[in-house]
Amino acid sequence: MKTIKFLALAAVLALTACKATTPTTTTTTTPVSRDLYPDASQARTDLAAALNTAATTHKRILLDFGGNWCGDCKVLDIYFHDPANQSILESRFVLVHVNIGHMDTNLDIAERYEVPLEKGVPALAVLDEHGKLLYSQKGGEFEAMRRIEPAEVTKFLVQWEPEKPCSTVMVNC
């Protein structure tokens, strides 16, 4: 009986020692907002606020059309929170999530910015600081975000970020 108790105690101590020496790794995950796309009636207000902000900060506006039901839209949001992408977004863009409901809401905004929602969501459009359309997705490029790498989002953001303002020190701007 003493032998069994001794072996049990030795096993517990050995497991405790192993656990203490096992390196731990931490994984940082970006929480996905359940309501990524605000109430559909808020889109016009958010767009007007973005236009004001962009005009004063000289940022571009990134319109993200989608719905809270859309898994690929949530993947895009995770990619937006990738440190490299988040830095570009925060410093160069004003992001507006446009809730399209179940392809039946805010269709006038999508039409105004030439975004063919029938090609799928998420769908993106880029406006300059004055609200002029610079780019709209025509072929559902981000419709299958689950198959796209975060680097593709980085490439897109870099392609459409505004030019850096000319410094007064630079002669040939």
Identify the residue ranges that each predicted region occupies.
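C-terminal motif of bacterial Sec signal peptides marking the signal peptidase cleavage site
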Residues: L15-A17
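A short beta-strand-turn-helix
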Residues: D39-I61
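Conserved redox-active cysteine motifs that mediate thiol-disulfide chemistry
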Residues: F65-F80
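Thiol-based oxidoreductase modules, predominantly thioredoxin-like and allied folds used
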Residues: I78, D82-L107
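Non-catalytic, surface beta->alpha helical segment in thiol-disulfide oxidoreductase systems
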Residues: K119-C166
